[in-house]
Amino acid sequence: MINRFSIEKVKGLEIIDSRGNPTIRVFVRTNDGVESFGDAPAGASKGTREAIEVRDENGLTVKRAVDIANYIIDPALHGIDVREQGIIDKILIDIDSTENKSKLGGNTIIATSIAALKTASKALGLEVFKYIAGPRLPKIPIPLLNIINGGLHAGNKLKIQEFIILPIKFNTFKEAFFAAIEVYRNLKGLISERYGKIYTAVGDEGGFSPPLEETREALDLIYTSINNAGYQGKIYMGMDPAASDFYDPKKEKYIIDGKELNPTQLLEFYLDLAKEYPIVYLEDPFEENSFDMFGELQNKLNSTIVIGDDLYTTNIKYLKIGIEKRSTKGVVVKPNQVGTISETFEFTNLARRNSIKLVTSHRSGETEDNFIAEFAVGIESDFIKTGAPARGERTSKYNKLLEIENKFGLEYGGKYFYL
């Protein structure tokens, strides 16, 4: 039955992301003229099981994705109630009919799915996070700030992709976030002093990429910056090795810090680091099929949360394996990895039922849209990972969280977080 919530138009638009690469924005409009949009982000380091993007000319355009939105998705969703997220996403999945979303494109599908959700919340006069959360009052997640970059995110010799700080022991998000900024500023000064001002330029996610070669060099810089800022015992450390990127499958070895390590040696390497530094977060420490090694490491690191990103790719099929093997205490949530909001909800609900912590994450290729911040609050994610406190496409998410806390008085999750 056609009503004011019925979808009247779906329209695609080619835009650019924060790396200057093309991506797709999809608009969804109701019969009442209410309209919103969804943007498709893109990762630099991708799991092999992620939804496939539709791109043309060696990735230089997304014209085909725009055509798919305009000529296939538009008529398919015409007249559907925009509040029916499950029905909308099922139609998209059925039309695509592939396991990896390669027909319509994961980018086209997720942009449409996000646009539908945002339009529905707007039509109902609700904030996006409130529309997702329902009657419960969620908490603001703990931010994971990626302040030193390595791996595929940088041009230095560091193999670890992200070195992270976590401001945990604070009463409010604002307090926590601005304390983290103090550490970021201290780090900038330290890098400038030791390596030269040229190395304080920021990378794709707003972090620094000083000319470092070994993991401990980066950890020492961050540890010193935390202490200099006076936040020892309140701001902790984490890493995202993205280990698939420095794994040699032929040798079955990990190439890191000038050494070739087998999985057991790499595990010992992480255990040593956890003894030396206040590391409470470790994401993708092994290559993406190593469910057992993830579990062994998690079992030995009681005070550190081992997280699966490429291990799961926000896919319930792989999460079930991880649950059975007790691989991790946490999962990364990236809606564009699986392709629809409904499938993302299935994933987060299963994780929650099994007491697994949620880490809602941006991608390295982002836009200025702050949807992922609202999404993180709405699902009451334990953490949010959206880069350093620099670059507009990163700060837009943090500013949205500050606004939500100020306007709605939500409590900060870090206040209740115990290691």
From Swiss-Prot:
The keyword NADP does not apply. Its main location: cytoplasm. GO terms for cellular component: cell surface; extracellular region; phosphopyruvate hydratase complex. It holds the Pfam family Enolase_C. (2R)-2-phosphoglycerate binds at Q161, K334, R363, S364, K385. Its cofactor is Mg(2+). The active site is at E205, K334. SUPFAM superfamilies: Enolase C-terminal domain-like, Enolase N-terminal domain-like. Its EC number is 4.2.1.11. It is an enzyme of class 4 (lyase). GO terms for molecular function: magnesium ion binding; phosphopyruvate hydratase activity. This is Enolase. The lineage of its organism: Archaea, Thermoproteota, Thermoprotei, Sulfolobales, Sulfolobaceae.
